[in-house]
Amino acid sequence: MKAFTKITAIVAPLDRSNVDTDAIIPKQFLKSIKRSGFGPNAFDEWRYLDHGEPGMDNSKRPLNPDFSLNQPRYQGAQILLTRKNFGCGSSREHAPWALDDYGFRAVIAPSFADIFFNNCYKNGLLPIVLTEEQVDRLFKEVEANEGYQLSIDLAEQTLTTPGGETFTFDITEHRKHCLLNGLDEIGLTLQHADEIHAFEEKRRQSQPWLFNG
């Protein structure tokens, strides 16, 4: 998992509430259990004018010019700004995989669906909760300023605008530690590999019948 420390990046607006996981990555693309390769189909039904299916050459598909992420000014964005209850619907972990593979490192919203919120942290994607008033202000600034960028400092838990205004956000110490160090659940477990091996060896000696056969 990629570590997250600091970024300064373009912000792409998605001015919709209640964006569900089927909108983030439609169900027909869920056949793979690899974490990569979902980016070209993120927001597929809004992003393209035709119906997408696995195996299609996305470079030849007609783009929807009205979809914000297709606009030239938002190309290369690493921060997604959206509205309340983002990531609702089914619990598919493919949704944060698709956002990460698209290139997003952080998502800002007034609220997130709980399962999606937790899945973001497991996959190196930082979900930032701000108030609706703060999100409204950011939408206005993004719309008014082409190439608008925000700076996110995870260690300090701050988000800074080009004008120097700073917002703070909450995150548990455990989640912050994992993101700063690029640790998913497997990586976190491997940090304790020596203790695990020592425990297993001690148990092997004290309860050998468990290991016979």
Swiss-Prot record:
<dbReference type="InterPro" id="IPR000573">
    <property type="entry name" value="AconitaseA/IPMdHydase_ssu_swvl"/>
</dbReference>
<dbReference type="InterPro" id="IPR033940">
    <property type="entry name" value="IPMI_Swivel"/>
</dbReference>
<dbReference type="GO" id="GO:0003861">
    <property type="term" value="F:3-isopropylmalate dehydratase activity"/>
</dbReference>
<keyword id="KW-0100">Branched-chain amino acid biosynthesis</keyword>
<comment type="subunit">
    <text>Heterodimer of LeuC and LeuD.</text>
</comment>
<dbReference type="InterPro" id="IPR015928">
    <property type="entry name" value="Aconitase/3IPM_dehydase_swvl"/>
</dbReference>
<keyword id="KW-0028">Amino-acid biosynthesis</keyword>
<comment type="similarity">
    <text>Belongs to the LeuD family. LeuD type 1 subfamily.</text>
</comment>
<dbReference type="InterPro" id="IPR004431">
    <property type="entry name" value="3-IsopropMal_deHydase_ssu"/>
</dbReference>
<comment type="pathway">
    <text>Amino-acid biosynthesis; L-leucine biosynthesis; L-leucine from 3-methyl-2-oxobutanoate: step 2/4.</text>
</comment>
<protein>
    <recommendedName>
        <fullName>3-isopropylmalate dehydratase small subunit</fullName>
        <ecNumber>4.2.1.33</ecNumber>
    </recommendedName>
</protein>
<keyword id="KW-0432">Leucine biosynthesis</keyword>
<comment type="function">
    <text>Catalyzes the isomerization between 2-isopropylmalate and 3-isopropylmalate, via the formation of 2-isopropylmaleate.</text>
</comment>
<dbReference type="GO" id="GO:0009316">
    <property type="term" value="C:3-isopropylmalate dehydratase complex"/>
</dbReference>
<dbReference type="Pfam" id="PF00694">
    <property type="entry name" value="Aconitase_C"/>
</dbReference>
<dbReference type="InterPro" id="IPR050075">
    <property type="entry name" value="LeuD"/>
</dbReference>
<dbReference type="GO" id="GO:0009098">
    <property type="term" value="P:L-leucine biosynthetic process"/>
</dbReference>
<keyword id="KW-0456">Lyase</keyword>
